[in-house]
């Protein structure tokens, strides 16, 4: 079954962007390549029980088993050792990526308390969009009674676009709730 957001992109959004951005070919337009979700654990990464429960939570949120990231250096001030667990990360592509973005935009983000929108300043010079979420419990897949600690997520949406304006146009068409100019 084709995800709803993927179908919407190919049938409606891609032709609209071709017209508005002035592309000669439909496939020259911006496209979401992948979504990378990172959850840093810090010193909690050394605890196997916490690591396992957090890995399960991130797996439920993304629908894919996360990979463990490790510290690259030992830093005495942060009490970290080289090679110990630093966090978890998941890279989503294809159908799982579209399903995650659909759930993020339509279910998870509206559940954030006092949510006014995403900052449009999160674009880099290549057009990729990065933002953070302070509480992973906004996703309905996470059982609130079973979590030990509320953790944050870093989400990077990698987009193949010529510049950040084209990426912004794509994410707006995908219903990303950006803060409008003039709203504070």
Curated annotation (Swiss-Prot):
Q: Does the keyword Phosphoprotein apply?
A: no
Q: Name one GO cellular component term.
A: ribonucleoprotein complex
Example of a GO biological process term = translation
Give TM segment ranges. none
* Entry GO MF terms: rRNA binding; structural constituent of ribosome; tRNA binding
**Is tRNA-binding there in the keyword field?**
yes
What keywords were assigned to this record? Ribonucleoprotein, Ribosomal protein, RNA-binding, rRNA-binding, tRNA-binding
Pfam family of the protein (one): Ribosomal_L5_C
- Cystine links in this protein are none
The record's section on PANTHER family has:
60S RIBOSOMAL PROTEIN L11-RELATED
Instruction: Describe the function of this protein.
Output: This is one of the proteins that bind and probably mediate the attachment of the 5S RNA into the large ribosomal subunit, where it forms part of the central protuberance. In the 70S ribosome it contacts protein S13 of the 30S subunit (bridge B1b), connecting the 2 subunits; this bridge is implicated in subunit movement. Contacts the P site tRNA; the 5S rRNA and some of its associated proteins might help stabilize positioning of ribosome-bound tRNAs.
Q: How does it assemble?
A: Part of the 50S ribosomal subunit; part of the 5S rRNA/L5/L18/L25 subcomplex. Contacts the 5S rRNA and the P site tRNA. Forms a bridge to the 30S subunit in the 70S ribosome.
For this chain, the family text in UniProt reads: Belongs to the universal ribosomal protein uL5 family.
Protein name per Swiss-Prot or TrEMBL: Large ribosomal subunit protein uL5
């Amino acid at each position: 079954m084709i995800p709803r957001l993927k179908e919407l992109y190919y049938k409606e959004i891609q032709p609209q962007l071709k017209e508005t951005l002035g592309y000669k070919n439909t496939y020259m337009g911006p496209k979401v390549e992948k979504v990378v979700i990172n959850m840093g654990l810090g010193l909690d990464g050394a605890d196997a029980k916490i690591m396992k429960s957090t890995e399960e939570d991130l797996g439920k949120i993304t629908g894919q088993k996360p990979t463990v990231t490790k510290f690259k250096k030992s830093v005495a001030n942060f009490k970290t050792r080289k090679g110990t667990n630093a966090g978890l990360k998941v890279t989503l592509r294809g159908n799982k990526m579209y399903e995650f973005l659909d759930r993020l935009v339509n279910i998870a983000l509206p559940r954030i308390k006092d949510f006014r929108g995403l900052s449009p300043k999160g674009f880099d010079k290549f057009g990729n969009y990065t933002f953070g979420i302070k509480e992973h419990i906004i996703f309905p897949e996470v059982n609130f009674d079973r979590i030990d600690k509320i953790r944050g997520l870093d989400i990077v949406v990698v987009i193949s676009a010529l510049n950040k304006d084209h990426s912004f146009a794509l994410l707006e068409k995908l219903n990303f709730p950006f803060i409008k100019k003039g709203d504070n």
